[in-house]
Structure formats: structure tokens, C-alpha cells
């Protein structure tokens, strides 16, 4: 062990770092992060004496004590000073632009006349409705809480986290609440006719009725049916109690109602008002220790650059409003502060901050000292975060879409449309993701003893399918039951065709084990109760896989005249599936179309490569770098868009870390005729052992109609070891 003291220079500051060399470079990076707030993955550390880049191979004991921290985005160490100078010049221009904008504000400030506060104060009253127990109770009753809790746990399990903390569970539940709300609430362009349901045409505004005013509908839009003489009213309700009932509206109604749901489930939440005509929600994440952007209209979370970068919005004021106060959060949503500042002409910056502080003090007047101190600390931390965010580099690898909610022509008119192809968040710089899919392999393996028992007993194919459908029905009953108390009954009778043959019960052992289920014979001996064995999340993540696999197995067996031992081979029987490795792709769609979705065994999920139509790749690395000889693989088409199916591809293997690749299989002009169609391929390359496998997809079915590639599943099968 060598104790070192480094002096790290970053921008205009120097930091002393005490460090033990045996701790490794990773610890040094985190020490530097604690001082500079530059994340470890964004650090380039340079020894100033010889201008060498510090890497894992560097001798930290003999390294120069003077280090320089530079941007990870620089092309080389040699041009770092030039890049810094360029950044300094750009910063100077931005600061000058800010000064000019502030100077301009002085001339327009006289026009304020309380306009800014007048726009904010009504929302301060509105957010207090979210604290009403009656409104919260009404909202709570409409949410399938157990279902969302289960989905939250499964989402964490897919990342390998089977024992999450409360903060992690809360954050995962919040995201599931967002996705549920996106599907439950309805966007209204023109409401359908109240009488016949046909299209309507706007006729202007009408006078609100007393019943509409009772729920804050001061504005009522009037529409005329194109097919009948009926007039349809569209009250713009502001009371979330009514919105919980109607479940429809535009961005104002969506954000208003969703923020109530967030408060109902205990999240620190605030309504975000964008003065360029949009509204959304923020919630505080205790696991991430920061406020999270949530847009219920778009179903997008933690993507604050969505509006400036994706929608091309020219932001000016973005104000957060909650029961605890009012805050200017514009800097979270822009990387062009000097441009935004030039558009902030309602009042001066100092007057704006004074006004927000006044509103905040009003809301916090009755708080106890401890609560007030916590809020003030969080406020300070947020302001520091906003300043860091303003000057941090934008992630160029993430592509943000134009607006998706609302009529196409309306979005185009507002210049928020984007493009037809770019309709979701995607990334061209994917992380290495771990495949949590050992349960998929175990489920596939568990069908062999079941089928073997059927063959040994001479069961006809028709009867085999009947028995498999009984197993499937039990799994359906379990999946539909509350996830904490899953239980189903299997009736036993060797002679009754409508009951499960008792002699086949032992053959189910491996399947139940793969699903984290247990069986217990009832006291009458005529049925078996199947229930969870305590590993609730493992059962939840595995049940959909087993159901999809059983559906496929029943469909495959229907093609057989007879079932014998020779039938129990690939592709009917899928043994020795490779699992638990890691995967890296050329691109992916966030959050649902990530690379590991191709290995999760679930038909409805898929890997999407937004720019993969004319070429993309996905690499699989085995667990612990184990060498495998691949003997077969399968690909499955996704749920929709046949034009995105892969048509030509090459499968390669490597045993030297990817320096060289051996072609294992090559396919051209492949066509998936159906959705969820599985195609099986045997590998003829003899005896090649590899721990890296790469698919290079060369083209999709119709490269002229899409830029995307999508794939429902990839399964790799190794030789028996």
C-alpha cells in the first residue's frame, strides 16, 4: 500500500486528494467526484508532467502528483487545452448574452403590473385540492394498486434487483402509475358526438352550466356533430375530483389529475406550469435524491430536455407549484439559458425571485422548524443541481421525439411535431445490460420431463394437448390472482378426461420449481393446491414466460400425428438455453424496447433499434466468460410492424474478447409470415467454442418504409456440457 496525495486541477480550481494506491482507480474517480461533482464515467484524468491519460493499467504509485481532470468528450488528451479555451470563449459569449437579456428586462419591467404573480397565484389554490382526503380517496379507488405494485417489483427484478429498498420500490411504483395513467386517461381533440359517437366540429365557446361551474369549468367548448343535429359540450374541468370520473381532457386536465394521483400515494409532487402552454408533473425521488420530470400526456419520465430538444419549444418560464411553495425550475429544462433569458420579459429576475419567495413564505408560514429546515435544505440542493445541470453537457446519444399527444395538424401548427419516425425516446449509446433470464431457461428445461412422461405412457397427441391446457389454465388462474396470495387448485382423477391425470403430477416438479411455486395435496386427496413459495417476485416474473411457452408448445404439438422419443428434440424441446449473460446493442428504444427485452422470454416485449433498418448489431457475452459451443438459435418476430422484421443477418462467435470473429451462421431473405412467429436455425460450424456472440442484422423486410429493426426474442442453445 502506498499513501499518495494528489493535487487535481479542474477548471479554475485545485483539489487535494488523499488516496491509497491499493484502492484502485475506481475509488480515485469517486474521490474526485465527491470534490468536483464530475461523475466517474465522465472523467478523463491526465498526469500533468507527461500529459499521459490515467487508465486502469497506470502505475498509481509512481504517477505524477499533479493531475488534471478534463471532459470525457474530448477527442484526445493533446487538444484538451484548446477545447477548454473554446469552452471558455463560448461561456463568455453566453454570459454576455445573459447580461444583454437582463439589461433588456429593465426596460420591459414596467409592463409587469403584477401579471406574473397573477398567472401563478390561481395554481397555488389549485394544488391545495390535491391534499383533500375526499379527492384522494376517490382517486385511490380507481387505481389497481396490487397490479401496479407487482409490475413495479417485476421491473426491478428484470434489472436483477429482487430485494429493493423502500425508496426503490416507491420510485418503481411511481413509474408504473405513470404508465397506467397514460393508458387510462383519454386525450380529447374534438369530443365524439354525445348521441351517435360520430366526429364533431368546433363551434366556439358556450356559457358554463351551474353543474359545470361546480367543478371549475369556467370555459366550455361547443361542438356540432357532422352526422346528426346534436350539440356536444366539452367543459374544461379544473377540479381533479371530476377528472378522476371523466378521465379525459388535454394537457391541463392530464397534469392536474395525475398530480392528484401522485399526492394520493404519498409522493412529494408539484404541478409544473410552462408559460409556452404546457403542463406536467414533478415528483421527488428519495432514491435519486432529486426531483423527477413526469409528463403524463407523453408517458415520458426523467427527460427534462424533451421540450427544448424534442419539441423544439422556445421556453421562457417553467414554474413548479406545490403545497410547500413555488419555484422557478426553468434551468432544469434548458441548455440554452442565454436564449431563454432573452424571452423572459414579464418581469425582472430579481422581482420574479422576490415574488416566488413571497408565495413560498405564505405556504410555509405554519410549518414547524424541523419541517421548514428540511424544505429549505432541499431547496438549496435543488438550486445547486439546477446550476450544474445548466452547464453540464447534453447527452447527444439520446434522441427525444416531437410531441405525440394531440391531433397531428395541431402539433404541426404549434411547431412541436418532430418527425413520423422519431416517435419515442431512443439511445444510440447503450449501456451493457445484464440478462435476468435464468427462469426462462429453467422453464424451457422443465417441459422435457413432462413430455417424456407423456411419451412413456403412450398418451395421444390430442390428450397431451388437453393435459397441457389444464396446466396452462392453472397458471392463468395464478397469474390473475393477487400476487401476494396466489393460489389455484388442480383437480386430480386418472380416469376422468376433464381432470388432471394423477400419475403425471410428479412430472410437474421442475416446472413448479422454475415458477417458485409449491404444491400441497388437499385432505380429500382428489385435488392439489398450488401456491407461491414465498418468492413473490420470482413467481411474478416467471408466470408470463411459462404461459407464452405453453401456448407455443400446444400449437407446435398440434402439428404432430404421433409423439415419440424421437420427437423430443429441438425445436420442440428447447434444452440448454444460454442465460444470465450480458448484452450490448448498437441502439435501443427507452424504456420498453431495450436490448435485454429480446432475452426475457415474453412475447409482448421486444428489442427495438430505431436506426437499425439498414444495419445494426447486438452482442451477447456469456456469464463468467464461460465458453459455449452453440448448436442452434431461435428468433421470434415482434407484435407488430412486419416491415421491421430482420431479413438478412450473420451470427458470429468470438473467444478472444472480440478481436476476431468466426461466422457461425448466415441467413438471407428470411420472412416472418406471422406475428410472434418463432424461426429455428441449427448451426453447422463444428466445435467452435466462444464466449461472445454477435448478431449483425444487415437489413429489415422493407427498408424503404422504416428506419427501425425490431425483434421479439433471441434464444441461444449450447451443446450439453
From Swiss-Prot:
InterPro entries assigned to the protein according to its UniProt record, in alphabetical order: Galactose-bd-like_sf, Papain-like_cys_pep_sf, Transglutaminase-like
- What is an example of a Pfam family matching this protein? Transglut_core
Membrane-crossing residue ranges in chain numbering: none
Cofactor(s) annotated in UniProt: Zn(2+)
Gene Ontology BP term (one):
response to salicylic acid
One GO location term (cellular component): cytosol
Which keywords appear in this protein's UniProt record, sorted alphabetically? Cytoplasm, Hydrolase, Metal-binding, Zinc
Principal location: cytoplasm
Q: Which reaction does it catalyse?
A: Hydrolysis of an N(4)-(acetyl-beta-D-glucosaminyl)asparagine residue in which the glucosamine residue may be further glycosylated, to yield a (substituted) N-acetyl-beta-D-glucosaminylamine and a peptide containing an aspartate residue
A GO molecular function term, named singly, is: peptide-N4-(N-acetyl-beta-glucosaminyl)asparagine amidase activity
The entry's localization annotation reads: Cytoplasm
The record's function comment reads:
Specifically deglycosylates the denatured form of N-linked glycoproteins in the cytoplasm and assists their proteasome-mediated degradation. Cleaves the beta-aspartyl-glucosamine (GlcNAc) of the glycan and the amide side chain of Asn, converting Asn to Asp. Prefers proteins containing high-mannose over those bearing complex type oligosaccharides. Can recognize misfolded proteins in the endoplasmic reticulum that are exported to the cytosol to be destroyed and deglycosylate them, while it has no activity toward native proteins.
The UniProt family comment states:
Belongs to the transglutaminase-like superfamily. PNGase family.
Query: What is this protein identified as?
Result: Peptide-N(4)-(N-acetyl-beta-glucosaminyl)asparagine amidase
The record lists the organism as Arabidopsis thaliana
Per the UniProt record, the lineage of the source organism begins with: Eukaryota, Viridiplantae, Streptophyta, Embryophyta, Tracheophyta
Amino acid at each position: 500500500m502506498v499513501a499518495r496525495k494528489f493535487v487535481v486541477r479542474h477548471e479554475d480550481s485545485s483539489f487535494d486528494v488523499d488516496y491509497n494506491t491499493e484502492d484502485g482507480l475506481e475509488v480515485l474517480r469517486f474521490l474526485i467526484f465527491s470534490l468536483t461533482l464530475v461523475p466517474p464515467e465522465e472523467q478523463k484524468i491526465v498526469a500533468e508532467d507527461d500529459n499521459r491519460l490515467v487508465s486502469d493499467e497506470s502505475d498509481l504509485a509512481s504517477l505524477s502528483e499533479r493531475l488534471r481532470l478534463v471532459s470525457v468528450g474530448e477527442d484526445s488528451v493533446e487538444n484538451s487545452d484548446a477545447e477548454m479555451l473554446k469552452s471558455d470563449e463560448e461561456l463568455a459569449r453566453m454570459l454576455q448574452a445573459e447580461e444583454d437579456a437582463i439589461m433588456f428586462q429593465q426596460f420591459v419591467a414596467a409592463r409587469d403590473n403584477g401579471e406574473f404573480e397573477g398567472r401563478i397565484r390561481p395554481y397555488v389554490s389549485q394544488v391545495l385540492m390535491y391534499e383533500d382526503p375526499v379527492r384522494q380517496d376517490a382517486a385511490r379507488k380507481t387505481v389497481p394498486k396490487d397490479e401496479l405494485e407487482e409490475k413495479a417489483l417485476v421491473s426491478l427484478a428484470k434489472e436483477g434487483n429482487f430485494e429493493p429498498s423502500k425508496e426503490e420500490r416507491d420510485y418503481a411504483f411511481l413509474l408504473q402509475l405513470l404508465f397506467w395513467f397514460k393508458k387510462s386517461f383519454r386525450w380529447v381533440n374534438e369530443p365524439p358526438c354525445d348521441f351517435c359517437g360520430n366526429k364533431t366540429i368546433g363551434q366556439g365557446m358556450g356559457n358554463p352550466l351551474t353543474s359545470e361551474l361546480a367543478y371549475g369549468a369556467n370555459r366550455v367548448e361547443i361542438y356540432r356533430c357532422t352526422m346528426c343535429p346534436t350539440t356536444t359540450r366539452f367543459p374544461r374541468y379544473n377540479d381533479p375530483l371530476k377528472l378522476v370520473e371523466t378521465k379525459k381532457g388535454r394537457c391541463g386536465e392530464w397534469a392536474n389529475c395525475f398530480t392528484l394521483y401522485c399526492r394520493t400515494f404519498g409522493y412529494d409532487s408539484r404541478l409544473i406550469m410552462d408559460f409556452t402552454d404546457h403542463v406536467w408533473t414533478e415528483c421527488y425521488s428519495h432514491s435519486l435524491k432529486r426531483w423527477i420530470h413526469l409528463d403524463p400526456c407523453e408517458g415520458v419520465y426523467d427527460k427534462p430536455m424533451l421540450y427544448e430538444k424534442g419539441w423544439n419549444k422556445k421556453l421562457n418560464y417553467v414554474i413548479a407549484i406545490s403545497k410547500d411553495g413555488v419555484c422557478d425550475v426553468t434551468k432544469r429544462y434548458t441548455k440554452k439559458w442565454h436564449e431563454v433569458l432573452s424571452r423572459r420579459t414579464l418581469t425582472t429576475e430579481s422581482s420574479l425571485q422576490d415574488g416566488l419567495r413571497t408565495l413560498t413564505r405564505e405556504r410555509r408560514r405554519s410549518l414547524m422548524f424541523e419541517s421548514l429546515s428540511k424544505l429549505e435544505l432541499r431547496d438549496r440542493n435543488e438550486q445547486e443541481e439546477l446550476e450544474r445541470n445548466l452547464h453540464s453537457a447534453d447527452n447527444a446519444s439520446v434522441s427525444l421525439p416531437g410531441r405525440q399527444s394531440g391531433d397531428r395538424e395541431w402539433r404541426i401548427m404549434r411547431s412541436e411535431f418532430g418527425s413520423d419516425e422519431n416517435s419515442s425516446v431512443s439511445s444510440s449509446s447503450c449501456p451493457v445490460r445484464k440478462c435476468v433470464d435464468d427462469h426462462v431457461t429453467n422453464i424451457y428445461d422443465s417441459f422435457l420431463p413432462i413430455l417424456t412422461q407423456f411419451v412413456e405412457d403412450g398418451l395421444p397427441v390430442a390428450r397431451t394437448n388437453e393435459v397441457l391446457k389444464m396446466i396452462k389454465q392453472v397458471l392463468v388462474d395464478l397469474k390473475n390472482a393477487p400476487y401476494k396470495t396466489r393460489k389455484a387448485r388442480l383437480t386430480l382423477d386418472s380416469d376422468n378426461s376433464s381432470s388432471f391425470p394423477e400419475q403425471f403430477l410428479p412430472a410437474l416438479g421442475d416446472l413448479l420449481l422454475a415458477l417458485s411455486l409449491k404444491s400441497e395435496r388437499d385432505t380429500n386427496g382428489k385435488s392439489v393446491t398450488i401456491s407461491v413459495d414465498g418468492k413473490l417476485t420470482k413467481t411474478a416474473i416467471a408466470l408470463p414466460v411459462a404461459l407464452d411457452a405453453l401456448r407455443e408448445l400446444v400449437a407446435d404439438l398440434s402439428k404432430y400425428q404421433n409423439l415419440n422419443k424421437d420427437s423430443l428434440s429441438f425445436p420442440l424441446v428447447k434444452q440448454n438455453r444460454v442465460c444470465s449473460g450480458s448484452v450490448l446493442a448498437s441502439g435501443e428504444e427507452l424504456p420498453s424496447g431495450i436490448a435485454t427485452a429480446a432475452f426475457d422470454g415474453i412475447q409482448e416485449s421486444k428489442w427495438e433499434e430505431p436506426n437499425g433498418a439498414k444495419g445494426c448489431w447486438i452482442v451477447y457475452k456469456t456469464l463468467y466468460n464461460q465458453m459455449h459451443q452453440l448448436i442452434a438459435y431461435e428468433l421470434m418476430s415482434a407484435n407488430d410492424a412486419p416491415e421491421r422484421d430482420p431479413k438478412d443477418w450473420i451470427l458470429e462467435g468470438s473467444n478472444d474478447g472480440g478481436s476476431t470473429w468466426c461466422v457461425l451462421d448466415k441467413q438471407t431473405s428470411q420472412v416472418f409470415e406471422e406475428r410472434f412467429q418463432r424461426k429455428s436455425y441449427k448451426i453447422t460450424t463444428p466445435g467452435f467454442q466462444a464466449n461472445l456472440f454477435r448478431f449483425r442484422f444487415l437489413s429489415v423486410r422493407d427498408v424503404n418504409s422504416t428506419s427501425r429493426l425490431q425483434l421479439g426474442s433471441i434464444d441461444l442453445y449450447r451443446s450439453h456440457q
